[in-house]
Amino acid sequence: MSARDRLIVGLDLPTLAEAEKIVSALGEEVLFYKIGYQLAFAGGLDFARDLAASGKQVFLDMKLLDIDNTVAKGVENIVKMGVSMLTLHAYPKAMKSAVEAARGSNLCLLAVTVLTSMDEQDVMDAGYNYDPQSLVLRRAEQAHAAGMGGIVCSAAEAAAVRKIIGGDMALVTPGIRPAGAEKGDQKRVMTPADALAAGSSHLVVGRPIVAAPDPLAASRAILAEMESALSG
């Protein structure tokens, strides 16, 4: 895969108009976009369909979690949207039902392990007797066993996760920040080059591109860093 196949621009924006403006500005430079809750509930689901129909790849970041049948029925309808990736929380029964519902389609199901905004204290406060990396690795094992298409985790855990899941599953890493960029609300971050070196297959970059004075120039700089890392 080239850098352009691996870069996912996060459209974490409040309005459809802002998202459309970013996609227009990035043009053919960016092939892959992430749509999460914020945009999804502001017309983003129809926008996801339109992007997919136009030839772009779409990562629908819905982090599904519900009873088995509800998850399965939701996945069946999401398959019809033509998007490329969908997230679920890494709970075994939900993952297994989703895998069955997506069987035979091109939808890559991604297991969310531990949010990159969480540190060790956050994990403990949530009631887990694990440090973040141990919880990530446990959930990665469960996702692999369930037949999921990939894992979402921070680049800090990417190398350890890759050892567990092998080379075939996607490893999608949010919390990517170019050198010198502010972390924002992310606590476990890494540069694009370091994330690729750690085993990430896809990098999600939001604010460093969409909030940049020149989003196209920002995307090109990140793609150049990724290409350099991939060729090195």
Swiss-Prot record:
<dbReference type="GO" id="GO:0006207">
    <property type="term" value="P:'de novo' pyrimidine nucleobase biosynthetic process"/>
</dbReference>
<keyword id="KW-0456">Lyase</keyword>
<dbReference type="InterPro" id="IPR001754">
    <property type="entry name" value="OMPdeCOase_dom"/>
</dbReference>
<keyword id="KW-0210">Decarboxylase</keyword>
<protein>
    <recommendedName>
        <fullName>Orotidine 5'-phosphate decarboxylase</fullName>
        <ecNumber>4.1.1.23</ecNumber>
    </recommendedName>
</protein>
<feature type="binding site">
    <location>
        <position position="177"/>
    </location>
    <ligand>
        <name>substrate</name>
    </ligand>
</feature>
<dbReference type="GO" id="GO:0004590">
    <property type="term" value="F:orotidine-5'-phosphate decarboxylase activity"/>
</dbReference>
<feature type="binding site">
    <location>
        <position position="116"/>
    </location>
    <ligand>
        <name>substrate</name>
    </ligand>
</feature>
<feature type="active site" description="Proton donor">
    <location>
        <position position="63"/>
    </location>
</feature>
<dbReference type="GO" id="GO:0005829">
    <property type="term" value="C:cytosol"/>
</dbReference>
<dbReference type="Pfam" id="PF00215">
    <property type="entry name" value="OMPdecase"/>
</dbReference>
<feature type="binding site">
    <location>
        <position position="12"/>
    </location>
    <ligand>
        <name>substrate</name>
    </ligand>
</feature>
<feature type="binding site">
    <location>
        <position position="34"/>
    </location>
    <ligand>
        <name>substrate</name>
    </ligand>
</feature>
<comment type="pathway">
    <text>Pyrimidine metabolism; UMP biosynthesis via de novo pathway; UMP from orotate: step 2/2.</text>
</comment>
<feature type="binding site">
    <location>
        <begin position="61"/>
        <end position="70"/>
    </location>
    <ligand>
        <name>substrate</name>
    </ligand>
</feature>
<keyword id="KW-0665">Pyrimidine biosynthesis</keyword>
<comment type="function">
    <text>Catalyzes the decarboxylation of orotidine 5'-monophosphate (OMP) to uridine 5'-monophosphate (UMP).</text>
</comment>
<dbReference type="InterPro" id="IPR011060">
    <property type="entry name" value="RibuloseP-bd_barrel"/>
</dbReference>
<comment type="similarity">
    <text>Belongs to the OMP decarboxylase family. Type 1 subfamily.</text>
</comment>
<dbReference type="InterPro" id="IPR014732">
    <property type="entry name" value="OMPdecase"/>
</dbReference>
<feature type="binding site">
    <location>
        <position position="207"/>
    </location>
    <ligand>
        <name>substrate</name>
    </ligand>
</feature>
<dbReference type="InterPro" id="IPR013785">
    <property type="entry name" value="Aldolase_TIM"/>
</dbReference>
<feature type="binding site">
    <location>
        <position position="206"/>
    </location>
    <ligand>
        <name>substrate</name>
    </ligand>
</feature>
<dbReference type="GO" id="GO:0044205">
    <property type="term" value="P:'de novo' UMP biosynthetic process"/>
</dbReference>
<dbReference type="InterPro" id="IPR018089">
    <property type="entry name" value="OMPdecase_AS"/>
</dbReference>
<dbReference type="InterPro" id="IPR047596">
    <property type="entry name" value="OMPdecase_bac"/>
</dbReference>
<feature type="binding site">
    <location>
        <position position="186"/>
    </location>
    <ligand>
        <name>substrate</name>
    </ligand>
</feature>
<comment type="subunit">
    <text>Homodimer.</text>
</comment>
